């Protein structure tokens, strides 16, 4: 495996932190800015929507820019966004910082995902993608629990300053170890958008969207879930986040290896089906930590196991527009996060109990399984692809 893949993954740790760390510190942000937990949860939704909209659009607008230079520019904007978050005097300013962070993150992740599979042998393609997503999941394992502990001692703002410093380190690493990466000739953006009209491709993106929507219906409010069901202190909540994160870190490589071994077809069905089952088991296991922890670990493993298979699948069925399809898929992932966070907030507000978010989340993942069957059973329209 090319060591540069791991360097790209290291860069995604910083950008993963800024998105994922907020879920663990919602109570602190809400208290400091005098807003409700549900309102604070919008920080997750706004980031996800900003990422989803800007990712494909910025990729198209910057198609002619040399990729290393673009990567460094995106990292610098990301650094500035974290400074804005650190100094934000109110909720509105913090929201602005989230939009800036989302736009730069969208470019950084898509560039990482498009570069990584091109610098490894074809048989390692899914694993390379899995390693990139391992950077995101590492942010859960290390950042979220440490973020909870650090914010309890020094406040939540210091976290964004630290993430900004990580972005500067990433800029240094990329500038030293990567040579110029010429921009490749791309199909016009308007033509690439037309591929979404292909039911096989569109359904694949919907699998990602509904899987993440189901996941984040609960995960966006995981800290309150642990406090309500298991009556855990902040320390033990951070421990659970850490254990979840460790399993999620393993999810990316596991999903990549599974896809390379079984093929993307079987992997997608296996992961989505298992994910739906585990979502329904989560609230049933909260009678004891002995029952809950194994279920939670499996949940964490599966949460990042789908992405490598999905990205590899899209490269297989749409090779002529694979770059933009990977961007669309990460956008679908972010739309799912935003949708799930919003649905979780509504469910929590209407029912008054965070436990109901797990039941709702599991039901949403079932929709993802149905779309997986639709996509996987449709033939590849080679003629249509070649016309692009």
UniProtKB/Swiss-Prot annotation:
It is a multi-pass membrane protein. This is Purine efflux pump PbuE. Induction: Up-regulated by adenine, via the adenine-dependent riboswitch. Also up-regulated by hypoxanthine and guanine. It is found in: Cell membrane. The chain crosses the membrane at residues 5-25, 43-63, 72-92, 99-119, 129-149, 158-178, 206-226, 235-255, 262-282, 289-309, 328-348, 354-374. GO terms for molecular function: transmembrane transporter activity. Its main location: membrane. InterPro entries: MFS (IPR011701), MFS_dom (IPR020846), MFS_Efflux_Transporters (IPR050189), MFS_trans_sf (IPR036259). One of its GO terms (cellular component) is plasma membrane. Pfam families: MFS_1. The gene is pbuE. One of its GO terms (biological process) is transmembrane transport. Involved in the efflux of purine ribonucleosides, such as guanosine, adenosine and inosine, as well as purine bases guanine, adenine and hypoxanthine, and purine base analogs 2,6-diaminopurine, 6-mercaptopurine and 2-fluoroadenine. Therefore plays a role in maintaining the cellular purine base pools and protecting cells against toxic purine base analogs. Modulates expression of the purR and G-box regulons. Belongs to the major facilitator superfamily. DHA1 family. PbuE (TC 2.A.1.2.25) subfamily. Keywords: Cell membrane, Membrane, Transmembrane, Transmembrane helix, Transport.
């Amino acid at each position: 495996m090319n060591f540069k893949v791991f360097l790209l993954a290291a860069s995604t740790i910083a950008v993963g932190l800024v998105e994922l760390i907020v879920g663990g510190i919602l109570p602190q942000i809400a208290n400091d800015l005098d807003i409700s937990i549900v309102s604070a949860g919008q920080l997750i939704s706004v980031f996800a929507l900003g990422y989803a909209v800007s990712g494909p659009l910025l990729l198209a607008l910057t198609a002619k820019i040399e990729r290393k230079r673009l990567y460094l520019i995106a990292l610098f904007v990301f650094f500035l966004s974290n400074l804005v978050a650190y100094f934000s005097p109110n909720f509105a300013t913090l929201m602005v910082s989230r939009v800036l962070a989302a736009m730069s993150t969208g470019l950084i992740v898509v560039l990482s995902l498009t570069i990584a599979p091109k610098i490894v042998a074809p048989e390692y393609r899914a694993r390379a993608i899995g390693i990139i997503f391992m950077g995101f999941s590492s942010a859960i394992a290390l950042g979220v629990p440490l973020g909870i502990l650090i914010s309890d001692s020094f406040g939540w703002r210091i976290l964004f300053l630290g993430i900004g410093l990580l972005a500067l380190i990433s800029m240094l690493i990329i500038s030293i170890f990567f040579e110029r990466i010429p921009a490749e000739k791309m199909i016009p953006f308007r033509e690439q958008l037309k591929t979404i009209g292909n039911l096989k491709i569109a359904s694949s993106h919907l699998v990602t969207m509904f899987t993440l929507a189901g996941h984040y219906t609960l995960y966006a409010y995981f800290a309150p879930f642990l406090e309500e069901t298991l009556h855990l202190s902040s320390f033990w909540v951070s421990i659970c986040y850490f254990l979840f994160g460790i399993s999620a870190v393993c999810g990316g490589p596991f999903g990549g290896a599974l896809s390379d071994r079984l093929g993307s077809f079987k992997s997608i069905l296996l992961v989505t089906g298992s994910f739906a089952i585990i979502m329904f088991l989560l609230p049933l296991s909260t009678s004891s930590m002995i029952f809950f922890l194994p279920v939670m670990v499996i949940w964490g493993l599966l949460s990042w196991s789908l992405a490598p298979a999905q990205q590899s699948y899209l490269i297989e069925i749409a090779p002529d527009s694979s770059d933009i399809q990977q961007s669309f898929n990460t956008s679908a992932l972010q739309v799912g996060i935003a949708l799930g966070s919003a649905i979780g907030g509504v469910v929590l507000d209407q029912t008054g109990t965070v436990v109901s978010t797990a039941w709702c989340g599991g039901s949403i993942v079932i929709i993802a399984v149905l779309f997986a069957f639709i996509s996987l059973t449709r033939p590849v329209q080679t003629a249509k692809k070649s016309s692009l």
